[in-house]
Amino acid sequence: MIKLPSSIANEFANRGYYGTVSHNVKAQYQMYFGWFDGIPAHLNPLPPVEEGKKYVEAIGGEDEVMKKAREAYNQGEYRWTATLLNHLVFANPKHKPARQLLANTYAQLGYQAESGPWRNFYLTGAMELTEGIAGKGKANSNRARMSQNLSPE
């Protein structure tokens, strides 16, 4: 993990209130090299659903993934818990215990996040897992009416 030298790490402008060192380092690298991180396996990964199903199978099934995820959660290993459960939820979106534990995991990660955007993504992800995605499936009638009145130019 990359860390700033202690001589500048605690300066207000260098704190992770918006961006984070880990993201900024990646952004600097990507500015020169694009999205690719240099790992060949990341060139053409499986789609999340297919990858999730294969991970769940490789780990030994849904019950085994849940067992390992609960152990990791109880040990405070929230990033590993999120990784395990993310695969399970993509493999089986209707698995309620996995969705609930993943929501709890995202909440813990959100509470610990110094970065505002990270906190927002974690807590919004937790809410979406338990309450659904806001506005999904609802037509916006104003937008439809507006688009009918726009010219193609």
Regions found by a protein language model. Give the residues of each.
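Accessory terminal helices/loops
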Residues: 1-152
